[in-house]
């Protein structure tokens, strides 16, 4: 097909398909590069909607949001403006797993985005469905929509979330629909299959929502929180002045009886669902079956907006019929007279096999075509936003003829996320966990800014001035560490008496003790917390940095792109199959592919060495 037609008045630099959390980050990344962008979405009033829980952050996820902010993304800033509650998680478990979680006013979040995007000069927002990608010689050059519109562009980013050929499932009902009753379509799914892409069916779910006025709060536990002086964004000056509470209750024996009695009516257990659900966010039916020995399960009431008129019932995700949901809900303390605002449901949808992707999130099959978010088999707003940002950055790099930006595993959870997807793939919705990161002592909540700074600068998402400001912050911390190593506390000092010191020690050693409040030593130093973490974890950080350097060396060992793996002697059949499918670029990537063992890597290294020797001998 010709790249020019009567419908083509403008060739855009990029088209972003889908206005969810991934799509929004992609759009902003492209706009920061001063590129012309089209955003195609179903409903511009539901940009970055939250069809599941109204929250951002949590273990590992909160660190991802900090990384997004440090990389030049918007999720952290928007969350700070729309939050109605914010807190630390895992405070007692140490700084390596410390994370922020915030309850978000979901309506305000979407409104803030739309208001800001309307101001952007190089952006066109279209409400439509995509029906076909325009591809010629394995390169995308635009797309067609359901409304017969044609757009031409140098690159396309698909961020369709859970909307591709999706079905909402409740009991025996399977309704073609996207989340929150939005439109679905199989047009793009069919088009991707025609182009040769491997798709898979995945499933997720959501709980019922309850009118707050129908809840008996005398029977539930109120979460009382202090006002934390914290934010997701490193630049944000907005502070939450008042915390809005969430509430805790539990399922009962009656709840479990109703679920067990009606298990066959659940879409999940009736055989209606073929997609694989998220392992770490099971439905209430799954919990009752898999953990039958537990007498009760936690249920949290989370307000969806500042108005607090509707509560999200966290922990009660279900695909039961409406009558069973109502019966089930009324057995939970506090919900005896509950009125359901929206029933829970499961949703099944098409997703891409992420082994189809490069680390840049460009597809291997079609040049200039990028994928990000839940279409890549992930779950969660944070994972989606991170991918959208990386896809937006690299689509911009593609347009500008620059090298892609690829974040290493030792530099960020974003790097871990993408590396896992493109080397291991996933057969279930992938959720980021701290346990997935082998360098988590380095990938902390407090140092996301310095970890992402070089990538943000390379991407053009922060200025040289902003970059130097971050570098200056850590130079200041290093100078203060040196000062503290030369300053001592003697047993006669007031500080020594407070901490029962019997001998003279340096302030640096004292601040590294876990029971010492760093403010006693650094009352006026603005980066006291960061310094204290670095001092306390120094030995562990050095060890992980050393391990990371070994990984980096493997990343520098390139595998020839044209390598014929069938000629590599003594490879296991599984390694041969995986290498041919994934086509890793480096030995480091190859070593992380599931099913590949150290012997396979040795054989691969030996084969590459022989090839190099043969090339030299021919010269």
Curated annotation (Swiss-Prot):
Write down the Gene3D superfamilies for this protein, in alphabetical order.
FAD/NAD(P)-binding domain (3.50.50.60), GidA associated domain, C-terminal subdomain (1.10.150.570)
Which cofactor(s) are needed, names only?
Answer: FAD
Q: Which GO terms describe its molecular function?
A: flavin adenine dinucleotide binding
Primary site of residence: cytoplasm
Q: What processes does the entry annotate via GO biological process terms? A: tRNA methylation; tRNA wobble uridine modification
Key word NADP present: no
Does the UniProt entry include the keyword Kinase?
no
Arranged from A to Z, the UniProt key words for this protein are: Cytoplasm, FAD, Flavoprotein, NAD, tRNA processing
Superkingdom of origin = Bacteria
Residues the entry annotates as binding NAD(+): 277-291
Residues binding FAD, per UniProt: 18-23, 130, 185, 374
Q: Name one GO cellular component term.
A: cytosol
Q: What interactions and quaternary structure are annotated?
A: Homodimer. Heterotetramer of two MnmE and two MnmG subunits.
Quote the function comment for this protein: NAD-binding protein involved in the addition of a carboxymethylaminomethyl (cmnm) group at the wobble position (U34) of certain tRNAs, forming tRNA-cmnm(5)s(2)U34.
User: Could you tell me which HAMAP family the record lists for this protein?
Assistant: MnmG_GidA
- Put simply, this protein is called tRNA uridine 5-carboxymethylaminomethyl modification enzyme MnmG
Ranked from the top, the taxonomy reads: Bacteria, Bacillati, Mycoplasmatota, Mycoplasmoidales, Metamycoplasmataceae
Gene from which this protein is expressed: mnmG
């Amino acid at each position: 097909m010709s790249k020019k037609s009567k419908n083509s008045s403008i060739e855009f630099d990029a088209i972003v398909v889908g206005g969810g959390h991934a799509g929004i980050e992609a759009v902003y990344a492209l706009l920061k590069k001063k590129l012309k962008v089209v955003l195609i979405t179903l409903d511009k009033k539901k940009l970055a909607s939250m069809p599941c829980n109204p929250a951002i952050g949590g273990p590992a996820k909160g660190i991802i949001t900090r990384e997004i902010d440090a990389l030049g993304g918007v999720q952290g800033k928007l969350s700070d403006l729309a939050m109605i509650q914010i807190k630390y998680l895992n405070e007692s478990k140490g700084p390596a797993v410390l994370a922020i979680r915030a309850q978000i006013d979901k309506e305000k979040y979407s409104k803030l985005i739309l208001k800001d995007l309307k101001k952007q000069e190089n952006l066109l927002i279209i409400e439509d469905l995509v029906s076909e990608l325009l591809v010629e010689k394995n390169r995308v050059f635009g797309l067609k929509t359901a409304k017969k519109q044609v757009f031409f562009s140098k690159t396309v980013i698909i961020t369709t979330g859970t909307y591709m050929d999706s079905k909402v499932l409740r009991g025996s009902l399977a309704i073609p629909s996207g989340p929150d009753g939005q439109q679905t379509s199989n047009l793009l799914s069919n088009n991707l299959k025609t182009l040769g892409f491997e798709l898979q069916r995945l499933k997720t779910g959501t709980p019922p929502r309850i009118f707050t006025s129908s809840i008996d709060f005398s029977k539930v536990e109120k979460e009382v929180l202090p006002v934390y002086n914290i934010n997701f964004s490193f630049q944000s000056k907005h502070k939450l002045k008042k915390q809005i509470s969430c509430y805790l209750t539990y399922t009962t024996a009656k709840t479990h009886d109703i679920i067990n009695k009606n298990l066959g009516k659940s879409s999940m257990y009736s055989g209606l669902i073929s997609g694989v659900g998220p392992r770490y966010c099971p439905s209430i039916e799954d919990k009752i079956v898999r953990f039958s020995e537990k007498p009760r399960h936690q249920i949290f009431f989370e307000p969806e907006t500042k108005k607090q008129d509707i509560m999200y019932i966290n922990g009660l995700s279900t695909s039961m019929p409406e009558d069973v949901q109502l019966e089930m809900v009324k057995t939970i303390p506090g919900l005896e007279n509950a009125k359901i605002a929206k029933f829970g449901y499961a949703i099944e949808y098409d997703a891409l096999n992420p082994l189809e992707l490069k680390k840049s999130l460009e597809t291997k099959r079609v040049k200039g075509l990028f994928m990000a978010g839940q279409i890549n088999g992930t779950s969660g707003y944070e994972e989606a936003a991170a991918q959208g940002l990386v896809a937006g950055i690299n689509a911009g790099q593609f347009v500008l003829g620059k090298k892609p930006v690829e974040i290493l595993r030792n530099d960020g959870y974003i790097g871990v996320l993408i590396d896992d997807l493109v080397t291991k793939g996933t057969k279930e919705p992938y959720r980021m966990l701290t346990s997935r990161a082998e360098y988590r002592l380095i990938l902390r909540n407090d140092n996301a800014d310095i970890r992402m700074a070089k990538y943000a600068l390379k991407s053009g998402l922060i200025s040289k001035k902003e970059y130097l400001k971050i570098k200056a912050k850590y130079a200041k911390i290093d100078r203060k560490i040196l000062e503290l190593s030369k300053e001592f506390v003697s047993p006669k000092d007031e500080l020594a008496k407070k901490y029962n010191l019997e001998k003279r020690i340096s302030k640096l050693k004292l601040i590294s003790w876990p029971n010492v409040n760093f403010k006693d030593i650094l009352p006026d130093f603005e980066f006291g917390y960061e310094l204290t973490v670095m001092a306390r974890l120094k030995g562990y950080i050095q060890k992980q940095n050393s391990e990371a350097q070994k990984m980096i060396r493997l990343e520098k060992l390139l595998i020839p792109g044209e390598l014929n793996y069938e000629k590599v002697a003594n490879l296991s059949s599984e390694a041969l199959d995986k290498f041919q499918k994934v086509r890793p670029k480096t030995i480091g990537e190859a070593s992380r592919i599931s099913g590949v063992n150290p012997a396979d890597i040795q054989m691969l290294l030996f084969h590459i060495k022989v090839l190099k020797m043969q090339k030299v001998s021919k010269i």
